[in-house]
């Protein structure tokens, strides 16, 4: 718990029985809010009451172990003179900001002197801006993959990487999308602890979310375009291989025909007993094969 100039910030790292009882003892929130706290994962939302608001936000978070994006769920109770932040799961996002405020008197003063609404703005703003490295990392990965593709790296591993990057972009956008409307609603709510002066701050967060939404939309289009390019290049390689195999089979047809005829166990075949004729026949077949290859080359089938 942090206190500054009539404002109390309570941060709950884990919603266990002790934390639950603390909230019920010290704050008179609606019973539906308490049910939400115990109900596991919740969708992003704002519940507006006479004396307080209850918010649930989702923040994109990078998970190194799986190289994927997950969402961290955060809850807020905000009223006149207090802010309660609740963290679900194993994320340390809120905890880091809480300790930063606790250990740095300047940050504590700047964040908490202007009331609970401004403190909530600073927390939400910091949380969303903390996702910037995720966006930059995805952009670098896509740029590097694009260069490799046009250097000739088009294989199953490339297709797999494209699928992973596309999954991460879609997950990021799926998490961010509801938050844009939620933050937009916050800028229009009028309470004693959320006055009109705070609207510009929440609009600024919304502008940032719109910016990263636009960036990820570009990334998604780039990935889709690269996927089509890789498919086309791989199909082209496959077609060239099939063409080469077809040419080989066509070129060997005369040899197959003659070997089939003279390989039969029959008598009376022309020049079957003449060794010189056999060699002449091989030379003739070789000439036919070369002629077929030249014709195919001129017609650009090779």
Where are these regions (language model features)?
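Hydrophobic alpha-helical transmembrane segments and their immediately adjacent juxtamembrane loops
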Residues: 207-302
């Amino acid at each position: 718990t942090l206190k500054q100039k009539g404002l109390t910030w309570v941060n709950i790292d884990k919603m266990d029985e002790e934390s639950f009882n603390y909230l019920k003892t010290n704050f008179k929130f609606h019973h539906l809010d308490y049910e939400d706290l115990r109900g596991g994962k919740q969708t992003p939302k704002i519940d507006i009451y006479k004396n307080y608001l209850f918010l649930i936000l989702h923040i994109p978070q990078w998970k190194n172990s799986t190289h994927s994006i997950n969402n961290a769920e955060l809850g807020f109770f905000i009223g006149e003179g207090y802010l309660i932040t609740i963290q679900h799961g194993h994320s340390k996002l809120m905890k880091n900001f809480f300790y930063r405020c606790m250990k740095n008197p300047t940050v504590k003063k700047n964040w908490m002197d202007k009331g609970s609404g401004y403190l909530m703005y600073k927390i939400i703003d910091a949380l969303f801006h903390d996702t910037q490295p995720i966006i930059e990392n995805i952009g670098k990965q896509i740029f590097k993959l694009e260069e490799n593709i046009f250097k000739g790296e088009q294989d199953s591993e490339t297709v797999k990487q494209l699928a992973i990057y596309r999954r991460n972009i879609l997950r990021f956008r799926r998490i961010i999308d509801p938050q844009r409307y939620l933050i937009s609603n916050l800028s229009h709510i009028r309470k004693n602890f959320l006055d009109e002066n705070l609207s510009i701050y929440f609009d600024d967060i919304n502008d940032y979310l719109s910016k990263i939404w636009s960036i990820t939309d570009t990334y998604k289009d780039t990935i889709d375009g690269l996927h089509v390019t890789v498919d086309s290049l791989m199909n082209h390689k496959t077609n060239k291989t099939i063409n080469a195999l077809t040419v080989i089979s066509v070129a060997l047809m005369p040899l197959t025909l003659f070997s089939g005829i003279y390989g039969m166990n029959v008598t009376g075949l022309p020049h079957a007993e003449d060794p010189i004729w056999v060699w002449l026949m091989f030379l003739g077949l070789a000439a036919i094969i070369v002629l077929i290859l030249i014709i195919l080359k001129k017609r650009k089938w090779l």
